[in-house]
């Protein structure tokens, strides 16, 4: 098991940067969501980039199975420690499949997949994805994602992820949903929400005439305080088109608001996750400054759709560039 104490921090130097040995062209994730025992199946389509072994980051993951090109691997074919999974001998192209078990309820770091209030949420910037599954968890590895998830339909009826929704429903007491993001993205922009939420919905017509479905997802009782947030989102989308010619590139854009989200707001592709402080506002309870903060933060995170999400950083010395550009 890749577990144990948080490893001591070591200095990271720009001069030490090396390109990844393997790139991930596509990743398929399948989640069986349970608060204390979530199972994550991952299927990575890999392509060699430079010489060297395949090293995947992973922390606090219980490895259940591993297969390479359909062949189950014995423990003599890989090495596993508290921070990584390494395969020393790899073909230049391969499909790697792993299954792991994680404990979102015990994840008090609020990094990776964790429980909060009404459900499951994620925060993967900067290195949270490695607490979900084994992966080259670095921003210069960009992949297309296909996500399936199942959860208790009574407790977690709403299942959200990046990209466009392909399917959803209820089967044998389990809610299920399937999402696909057609645009390559780094792992730090992965997002998942499974919770009992309600949505304020609207739509936006892009400059080319496409209809985009908009949703602001909040806890029950908070939906009356979302009008300003929805208006701010639509104004941001229009401004980005008019000023920079940047049209939104998916069919759906969602915001999910979490009361104890520890990052303020996060620009995950197609599924922004916010602290409620930057979403909820009405004339009875909010000041002018509150309204301005909602407008400012929603605009900033939406603008990351191009400067940060589609065009991202190579390493963690570069985010200041796209953040200031945004």
Spans of features found by a protein language model:
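A surface-exposed beta-strand-loop module
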Residues: 51, 58-116, 137
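Intrinsic-disorder/low-complexity, polar/charged segments enriched in Ser/Thr/Lys/Arg/Asp/Glu/Gln
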Residues: 26-28, 37-43, 51-53, 93-97, ...
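Beta-strand elements of well-folded, non-transmembrane domains
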Residues: 31-35, 44-48, 102-104, 151-153
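Hydrophobic helix-coil surface modules that form long, contiguous segments used
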Residues: 124-127, 135-299, 315, 322-325
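Surface-exposed beta-strand/loop patches in extracellular or lumenal glycoproteins
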Residues: 45-60, 148-150
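N-terminal, polar/Ser/Thr-rich
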Residues: 1-39, 114-119, 123, 135, ...
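Catalytic Zn2+-binding segment of zinc metalloproteases
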Residues: 302-317
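Short structured motifs
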Residues: 24-30, 81-86, 129-133, 161-163
